[in-house]
Design a protein with these regions (language model features):
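Beta-strand/loop edge motif enriched in small/polar residues
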Residues: 1-249
Length: 249
């Protein structure tokens, strides 16, 4: 059963991890410069403290295979951005079953791309893969380059709410083989689709998509999607349903 996410709850990292016996890596607060890839293995956890700015060098990625909390606060958010404004970083990836229950809240990710790590291609600047109970709240993901997806969720369960995706190089969000809920999202200026679904089961409400160069919602490959209280404006196509998919509006 999917854990219920209380958006108003203060996920204090020390309390959240107190029952864990694994090693916990802590980044921040303040500036953290990553000049080479940081990989957290599946027997460890990662906490990023409120008020942290992570500066990633050219092509550098953060891959975490254990449970992860980006513990930003509204008044003390987390920033993940380029060390050099002209050189994109790679990806932030949360991957694998031991990362179950990871949380991203009050974070802005900008200026990443794509990466090939440990014999796996991560196509989203922010990549969530093969995990369960992923939660993202009150965050912004923007200004990626090269990569097909700004946020890519694959083989995972999730809830994503109160977040903004903009200036996307390809699809702003790509859900593959995943299931979950999305609430109160703003999606602006995607060069391809606003949201692309493949073999996914998603309940979406209060989604606003503006200026998708292709489709606002692209629903394909036997997906089962419910959309309510949502709108698509200034886009090439509002909603496309194909490949034996089901859409309830």
């Amino acid at each position: 059963e999917t854990e219920k996410f209380d958006e108003n709850k203060d996920y204090e990292s020390s309390k959240y991890f107190k029952h864990m016996k694994n090693k916990v890596h802590v980044l921040g607060p303040g500036e953290v410069v990553l000049s080479s890839n940081l990989i957290i293995n599946n027997t460890e956890e990662l906490v990023v403290k409120p008020g942290t700015t992570i500066l990633l060098a050219d092509g550098v990625s953060l891959l975490t295979k254990g449970r992860t909390i980006f513990d930003g606060k509204p008044e003390n958010p987390i920033l993940v951005k380029r060390l050099d404004k002209d050189k994109p970083w790679g990806v932030v990836a949360i991957h694998g079953p031991m990362s179950k229950g990871s949380i991203i809240k009050n974070v802005t990710f900008s200026g990443g791309s794509t990466s090939f790590l440990e014999n796996r291609l991560f196509s989203g600047m922010l990549s969530i893969s093969w995990t369960e109970n992923f939660f993202m709240y009150n965050s912004t993901v923007e200004k990626n380059v090269i990569s097909d997806d700004t946020l890519h969720v694959i083989h995972s369960s999730f809830k994503i709410s109160n977040s903004h995706f903009r200036n996307c190089f390809g699809d702003c969000i790509d859900f593959d083989y995943s299931r979950g809920k999305i609430r109160r999202l703003k999606i602006n200026n995607s060069k391809n689709d606003g949201i692309d679904f493949m073999r996914s089961d998603v309940d979406a409400s209060h989604i606003k998509i503006l200026s998708a160069k292709d489709k606002g919602f692209s629903i394909g490959e036997m997906s089962n999607i419910k959309i309510s209280s949502s709108e698509v404006d200034a886009s090439e196509i509002g909603v496309a349903v194909k490949d034996m998919s089901l859409l309830e509006i």
